[in-house]
Amino acid sequence: MNNYDLVLFDMDGTIANTDAMIVETFHRLYKLYKPTVVRSDAELLYFSGPPIKETLKHEFPDYPLDEIFPAYRDISRGTYEDFIKEFPLVKETLLSFINKGIKVGVITNKNSSNADLTLKIVHLDDVIDYCLGSDDVPASKPDPRSIDMAMKHFNIVDKSKVLYVGDNTIDYVFASNAGVDCAILTWGPRGFTKETKPKYWVKDYKELMDAVVR
C-alpha cells in the first residue's frame, strides 16, 4: 500500500533545475534597470519560489509592474533553452509513482505557458498531464485553493493521502495552509525559516520514493 494517492510537485528547484535560469535572468534585469546594484548568485537564488510579481515589486520599486514584469518575462524566456536543466531520477520516480497507481501533478507560480515549456525542456511533458500555473488558479501559492482544485480533478477527498513536494519555505506554507503533508528537497542552496517543519526532509528523489511508497 502506498502512503499517498496523490503527489503534487512544485516546479522550479523541485522537478526542474531552474537555478541558473533565474540567476541569469535577474543579472540581465539588474544590468538594465539597476546597473549600479550587484547581487550575488546566492542572493538571486532566493528569488526562486515566491510569486515573481511580488519579487519584482520589492526589487524594482521605482518601476511600474506593467513595465518591469514584461521585461522579466521576455528576458527569462530567452534563457530557458540554455539554462534550465534536468534533475537526476525525477522522470524515473514519477513513472514509478504512476505505475504504482499514484496520481501526480504540478502546481507552480509560473504562468502556464512557461510551465509547459519547462516541462518540455526537462522531458516531463509526456509524464505530467496536469499542471496548474499562476494563470489557472484564483491566487498564487501559498494560497491553498489550487491544491483543492487538484484534489477535485483527481477525485481525491482525503487530504491525508495527498503530499506536496517543494524546495523552499513557501512550499511548506502552501502545503500547511491546504492541510496536506509536505516533503522538502534540500539539494538546493535555500534557506529555511525555523517554522519550516515538513513531514519529510529529503535530499533526493530516492529518499522521496522511500517516503511515498511502502
What are these regions (language model features)?
Residues 1-5, 95-98, 112, 116-214:
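Asp-based, Mg2+/Mn2+-dependent phosphohydrolase catalytic module
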Residues 2-91, 96:
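N-terminal helical cap/lid subdomain that shapes the substrate entry/recognition surface
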Residues 15, 86, 104-107, 139, ...:
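Conserved SAM-binding loop
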Residues 17-18, 48, 106-107, 166, ...:
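Small/polar loops that bind or transfer phosphate-bearing groups
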Residues 35, 102, 180:
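Short glycine/serine/threonine/alanine-rich loop segments
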Residues 37, 63-65, 104, 126, ...:
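Residue-level detector of short coil/turn "hinge" positions at structural boundaries
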Residues 78-106, 112-116, 144:
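Short, acidic loop-to-helix structural element flanking the phosphoryl-transfer center
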